[in-house]
Amino acid sequence: MLDNWFIGQSMSHPLHILAQSLLTFCFPNMPLLSNQQSGEAYAYEGLKNILSGDNVKEFLFEYRHYHSHWPLIHIATFDPFSANPGLVLAMCCIGAVYSDKLGSAEVRWLMERVRESVLKTSQVYKLAQAHQMANLDHQLAATTEEVQALVLLHSQFLWHGSQQLRQQVRDDVRALANVTRSASLFQPLSRDNPNASALHQPGPVTGEEVNSWNWNRWIENEKRARLTAYIYLIDASSTIFFNTQPRYDVNNITVPLPADDATWEARTSEDCASALGLRGPAAQKDNESGSRRAKQLALSEALCVLNGACPGQFPERATNAFGKFGMSIAFSLTYRMLIVVSSHPRRPCPNLSHPATASAKSVFKWRKHTPITGRQSWYWHATKRSQ
């Protein structure tokens, strides 16, 4: 990510105007607070001091450190001046952790104020509470940005919050699960959706993808794929580190794994198409470390082949770094559940009725019936030690 990645997108809009719009997002009635002595008025003044133009610039600048680990934002097209303010504020909260402008207590205070505002204004959050589905035909980009804001804040509360804040989001995890269902994140968009991307649909590459190539549609679908992987990893990590109940069944995640970094970081439509291989193998020279596949495997598909529940061998160079990391976490979660099943063979496991244990059952079957090979022996010995 460039150091000045967000500067130049809208040079006619000074940063103090961006800061003011973020403040208005949190306090839409701020003209009424100027002469008050209420708690809301004090909160407004506190947030006003934090969200100065210079601080917003600093926080967005520092967000690049987080982005290098979790590239959810499409930097080439992201414009903080026109993006959802809740998403920009969530990015500022994360950037503030890396900045020396604020202490931990101030960062956590900022996190709470931002989350309150995001929950009040998020349309997809309101739809999820009412168990309704978002309109992905006409509001896909807006819905995705709202979910990005909610998920980034959830992650920050979980890993950077105080003990009380961490418990708060662990208690609210059901609401986040409802949001993912409302946005239909774990399944590809239907083929008749005007925003659907051919390269994010199941099935082999047919060649028609070259004629139907649309960079904007590809970006929006790739955002959803990366967001899905991120949400699943948060849930799996919470299960592993905090012993919480898993919320998602990996077998139901049919969106593809994230595409190669070279495609996601491409600055133009043509560069992205070349990195995907739509312009032939020779044009993929800049995609040095990825899978070089126009389509990625789905997480459920990849794990099914790995644990032997599906026929065939795992394709060579089938995943990139992001995909490998996602599968390793998912496999760790499956292994954890397998230990529970194996440790109590005569006692029903309380998690067996939960859909997330389907993968664990598949691996248990694989361990029991599949001859041990060199690649599988490490797993067999690990499970034997746990019994």
Per-region residue spans from a language model:
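Structural helix-adjacent loops and short alpha-helical linkers that scaffold large soluble proteins
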Residues: S99-E106, S162-L165
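Short sequence/structural elements of tandem HEAT/ARM alpha-solenoid repeats
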Residues: A105-E112, Q167-Q168, E209
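Intrinsically disordered, low-complexity activation-like regions
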Residues: M1-G86, A90, I94, R113-A130, ...
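Short, charge-rich binding segments
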Residues: Q139-L140, L165-Q168
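Internal alpha-solenoid helical repeat scaffolds
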Residues: A141-T144, A149
